[in-house]
Amino acid sequence: MNDNKVMNRAADNIRILAAAMVEKAKSGHPGGAMGGADFINTLYSEFLVYDPENPAWEGRDRFFLDPGHMAPMLYSQLCLIGKYTLEDLKQLRQWGSVTPGHPEREIARGIENTSGPLGQGHTFAVGAAIAAKFLKARLGNVMNQTIYAYISDGGVQEEISQGAGRIAGNLGLDNLIMFYDANDIQLSTKTEVVTTEDTAKKYEAWGWYVQKINGNDVDQIREAIKNAQKETERPSLIIGHCVMGKGARKADGSSYECNCATHGAPLGGDNFVQTMKNLGADPENPFQIFPEVQDLYARRAKELKQIVAERYAQKAEWAKGHPEQAKQLEEWFCGKAPVIDWLKVEQKAGAATRGASATVLSVLAEQVPNMICASADLSNSDKTDGFLKKTHDIVRGDFSGAFFQAGVAELTMACCCIGMALHGGVIPACGTFFVFSDYMKPAVRMAALMELPVKFIWTHDAFRVGEDGPTHEPVEREAQIRLMEKLKNHHGKNSMLVVRPADAEETTVCWRMAMENMETPTALIFSRQNIDMLPAGNDYSQATKGAYVVAGSDEDFDVILLASGSEVSTLEAGTELLRKDGIKVRVVSVPSEGLFRSQPKEYQESVLPAGKKKFGLTAGLPVTLEGLVGADGCVWGLQSFGFSAPYKVLDEKLGYTGQNVYEQVKKLLA
């Protein structure tokens, strides 16, 4: 156990660096970082297990920061362990710096997750804890790590905390320890203005082990973490009553603590000078690490070296006795796509693509032992039950199953799956109705930003949901999610792969693309209703190019008909009528516009040559295909919310028939 005077000095060092970073940047959040310094210092100097030489070590503990605005605290702490330089800290929030305004995932520097939107970070931790339990059930104690999370008042207020708290308690995630920085201050007000709930009782009701402490007292923090580590049945919440802006002083030397003004702005001028003096820093040169703090972390580095050496030795001994599991461990954490025998997938002709997806999922459940599939209480409708039928639910005390029942909580489910991907070793997929993807959008964006290969399964893809009516008909959703295909990630690639297959066989190809895509998230959009198969002889492998000419198309064509999903078969019906009038037709299936636009220009031109008349059909907004059709033609799409009626009636009323395709193309060619 370290001397408390040194521990307090180290926490003050973090406070100094955090406040100085924000002051120099003229932007940021110093108050929370100053209040949380005692906890994060205690965690990193005495408890968190990681390998300083191998930051990607799969057996490391994980620390998930929820309030990304407290980046100065995390950067300062990571500076103390050598992951950042003092010069890096000086460049907070600047162009090209490694210290952006909110932390961005970088394992080499000790940052496990990108954080910013409150509530998501601690839910990632719940997902990571599930992944760790899942892997431990298959590999044993070689994966015996602890997942730590840090949450703020704002994160607790976010609705997603309900789902995260419920799931963690229900599953008994005793490997999860969360510190709640309860400083009672937020950006605009004191928390008492917006909430009077008893947070401790709430988490206890969810099945958590809850402790209340002084969040700035080293002894109490230390004891609380030890108690949490001993817990064997419940996740732990440590409610630390912290002082916002601890150590801050006003220009006249009076206290500036517990003041909303310190939350989201630099301390400023003489306030900053007096704060630095109060904390024992040189206001003219605050970017320093005190000698005793350097010694503290040098000792911890030696301790970690010994701890990690013992863990590696245990792993080596385990590998000798469990060669198959050792091989799995290496394969699951290597970042490569799993090997799958796709010939095992036998599709039923004319099936709904959600049903075709179930067929694929049943094979994946058998062939990909590190895959977890989830559903938000819709497994028998979104057909993720194809996976479930080959495994069983993950439940408290038994993580040998591979199906995660998230309950009616789409955003929570998505964030948990992101957390699984962040932990590593697990391939997560989650399903719900396409219309409910609206609930998931913030998480999908974070998955894309972090370049995580989560598979999002969205069914009931258009107005053909039918009788349920406009509340359940995602008319505008395809256009929205395909914007993610146009948005580039920081590696210059499409931030997301979005696929909407035309029939059962194309569904298999789309799932193959999803499973081979280990660089970005994938959206798989499936139909509720049955869909006719594309013409015999169709080369479905061409779907990997995003768009391709469907078999049976005429060589010397007069018009190109293009669509994705179930609309392709409607185009085929219209094509039969057009050919009776002597019109030659090329039909193009476009499961992924983003992927198609990533192909060489020569290929794009060969499929959709400029100057040729084009007709697009989409069950969504016309804008979904307007970029591909351009000035060469027109798009038939839905420009209003949907309606309640049997889907075949809606097809007739809304013009999604072969006859209407025939009539619209005739007008185009007139």
What is each model feature region?
Residues 1-34, 151, 155, 159, ...:
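Conserved acidic/glycine
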Residues 151-152, 180, 375, 432, ...:
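Short beta-strand/turn micro-motifs composed of small residues
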Residues 154, 183, 461:
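Acidic beta-to-alpha connecting loop that harbors the catalytic carboxylate
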Residues 1-146, 301-525, 530-532, 589, ...:
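Thiamine diphosphate
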